[in-house]
Design a protein with these regions (language model features):
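Compositionally biased, charged N-terminal/linker segments
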Residues: 1-72
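Conserved nucleotide-binding/hydrolysis micro-motifs of P-loop NTPases
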Residues: 12-16, 92, 142
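Short, well-ordered loop/turn sites that connect or cap secondary structure elements
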Residues: 73-80
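Short connector loops at helix/strand junctions that flank enzyme active sites
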Residues: 80-81, 94
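Structural motif
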Residues: 83-85
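Aromatic- and Lys/Arg-enriched surface recognition patch
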Residues: 94-143
């Protein structure tokens, strides 16, 4: 059995993303932004073609390549079932909570489970920049 990897994942994002992200985390889903990229086709492209798939999408949108694209890369490609994720600021900014990735499914806005869809009101959902989700379980809160 491979040793698990450890990741730090800071939750932030557009207006209302913080609140919805924390609701998702309470319900067992870790989230990341990139809603403009959110599709299962994009996930498959990243898994097959690596970071170049992210870079290509950036360039199609006429965006300059930025370092934060590596956060999306780690979320989609490097995080695996059994890995641990340290999330600062949840439930408060003074502490870190630890979660474990429970499977290798990556959800996007075109295949999200009903329990994700039901979180947040319509106004929050429209304004939040959330695009990808991973199922997690709590290991330790408020460390």
């Amino acid at each position: 059995m491979e040793k698990p990897d450890y990741f730090m994942h800071r939750i932030n994002g557009g207006k209302n993303a913080f609140e919805i992200s924390h609701k998702l985390l309470e319900s067992g889903y870790l989230s990341i932004g990139w809603s403009d990229f959110s599709s299962q086709q994009f996930v498959q492209d990243v898994i097959k073609n690596g970071i170049s798939a992210i870079d290509e999408k950036y360039q199609l949108e006429h965006w300059a390549l930025s370092r934060n694209r590596w956060c999306l890369w780690r979320f989609l490609k490097e995080m695996q079932s059994g890995d641990y994720v340290l999330v600062p600021g949840f439930p408060n900014w003074e502490n870190v909570s630890i979660y474990k990735i429970v499977d290798n499914t990556i959800y996007s806005n075109d295949n999200m489970p009903n329990d994700i869809k039901s979180l947040g009101d319509e106004r929050e959902k429209e304004q939040a920049d959330l695009g990808f989700y991973r199922k997690v379980e709590v290991v330790k809160k408020d460390v």
